[in-house]
Amino acid sequence: MANLQQQKIRIRLKAFDHRLLDTSCEKIVDTAKRTSASAVGPIPLPTRRRIYCVLRSPHVDKDSREHFETRTHRRIIDIYQPSPKTIDALMKLDLPAGVDIEVKL
């Protein structure tokens, strides 16, 4: 009864390239399991599509338009019972520049 709320680290990852995101998730989960912490995930969240509509011509032809889109892929990883060794290993982990990482304790 003493430890009702167990310690948890929640890691949110965002990237435009899903392959980079998946390899980063694998690295994080492997690091957590090597340091004897239990990892849940990666849990895929809905992908955000942002569509931009641009006129093709600089002057006339309003009917001629072009659409561009960016897709933001997101994942969540929960790490339960992290030791100081786990936190240190996660801080030293080298991840690609195209992946945005947000960590909550």
Swiss-Prot record:
Disulfide bonds: none
Family annotation (Gene3D superfamilies): Ribosomal protein S10 domain
SUPFAM superfamilies recorded: Ribosomal protein S10
A GO BP annotation: translation
GO molecular function: structural constituent of ribosome; tRNA binding
SMART domains for this protein: Ribosomal_S10 (SM01403)
Cited PROSITE patterns: RIBOSOMAL_S10 (PS00361)
Keywords per UniProt: Ribonucleoprotein, Ribosomal protein
Description of how the protein assembles with itself and partners: Part of the 30S ribosomal subunit.
Annotated PANTHER family: 30S RIBOSOMAL PROTEIN S10 FAMILY MEMBER
Family under the similarity heading: Belongs to the universal ribosomal protein uS10 family.
Record-linked HAMAP family: Ribosomal_uS10 (MF_00508)
Described purpose of this protein according to its UniProt entry: Involved in the binding of tRNA to the ribosomes.
This protein's name: Small ribosomal subunit protein uS10
Native species: Cyanothece sp. (strain PCC 7425 / ATCC 29141)
